[in-house]
Amino acid sequence: MSENIQLPNHTFPTTQGEVNLAELTNEWLVLYFYPKDSTPGCTTQAVGFSCLKDQFDALNCQILGVSRDSVKAHQNFTEKQSLTIDLISDKEEILCKHFDVIKEKNMYGKQVMGIERSTFIFHNQQLVKSYRKVKAAGHAEQVLQDLKALQVAS
């Protein structure tokens, strides 16, 4: 593992209230970053994690999605897609910058700065696995499989 990222001691607004990542009590955490609510790839990813939430819960693992969208946009996305996971609003890009997920992207022929789809697994507040340049389809299943393997190894 070449990345050494700590969870920041900062409170963020979420669809279910607020969360301070440094104060989470779950043994395991999946923190995934996605570009924008209600877009095809992001919907695929969020629905994938939501469908597997019970399996992650059984492994004492919390799932949190992060984007720059507002809490209201997250709530609309959650309601429309019947999501069961909590989403963090990072409008000020505090988490995005902390995890270095803001990258230059080509969108409709223009260079823009946006979130590079990325996921991080933490065990007892320590980063144990990271995924960069994630493909949305099948990603939640891969993370669940990797989490099970990490738990066997720990």
Regions found by a protein language model. Name each.
Residues M1-S154:
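Chalcogenol-based redox active-site neighborhoods
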